[in-house]
Amino acid sequence: MRVQGQLDIPLNATGRWQAKKVADELIGVEFDAVVSSDLLRALETAQLSIVRKGVLPAPTGQIQLQPELRERHYGMFQGLKYVEAQQQFPEDFAAHANRHLEFAYGNGESLSNFAARVNKVMSALAEQHAGNTVLVLTHGGVLDVIYRMATGLPLQAPRNFPIPNAAINWLEHANAQWSVNDWANCVHLERALDELAP
């Protein structure tokens, strides 16, 4: 598995299939806005989701691109397989594995700076879309920070929750606080696989 970070790569066939299954699952949900990272893999997911089932909201009828929802910049690790990063940069990989707050992958983004970026954009979205239902398309690292924001799990703590690709997560913002209503829901993907079984 490669460290993608902010490398701007398109979805593969599996990713496109997953995006269509997300769209199927969201039939009947009315969104007031669709906000996406501007990285191609998130934007393609947004486009496939809204075009497939017509969930594009009124009045704008557009996806709002938000660069602040980009994945973390993994600097010198980007494009490498995890095993390659560990072999080429053993001390740096240890800092990564230990979730060192200020480790920035050379020219990348530290965990503390990344978390501050995610907190800022989520606060802005909550304020801008108060009382509305918003479809947000982003990346695993961003979701890691969002989950920790909502649950109080410290940034340095090992991850004890899943972040599967194309899962649906439902969060709510009320009284200046995020809460998780449903996390890592993959029923739409499992159901689709069952349909393919002999």
Can you annotate each of these PLM segments?
Residues M1-L48, R52, A104-N119:
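Loop-to-helix element that buttresses phosphate recognition and phosphoryl-transfer chemistry
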Residues R2, D92-Y105:
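Short, basic/glycine-rich phosphate-binding loops at helix/coil junctions
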Residues K21-F93:
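Phosphate-coordination/substrate-recognition cap region in phosphate-metabolizing enzymes
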Residues E25, L48-R52, A124, Q128, ...:
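Active-site catalytic microenvironments for nucleophilic, acid-base chemistry
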Residues E30-D32, A130-V134:
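Short coil/turn segments at beta-strand junctions that form active-site/ligand-binding loops
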Residues R41, V142-L143:
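Alpha-helix capping/helix-boundary segments
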Residues Y74-E84, E127-N132, R148-P198:
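Acidic, low-complexity terminal tails and accessory targeting/binding regions
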Residues H139:
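Short basic (Lys/Arg) and small-residue
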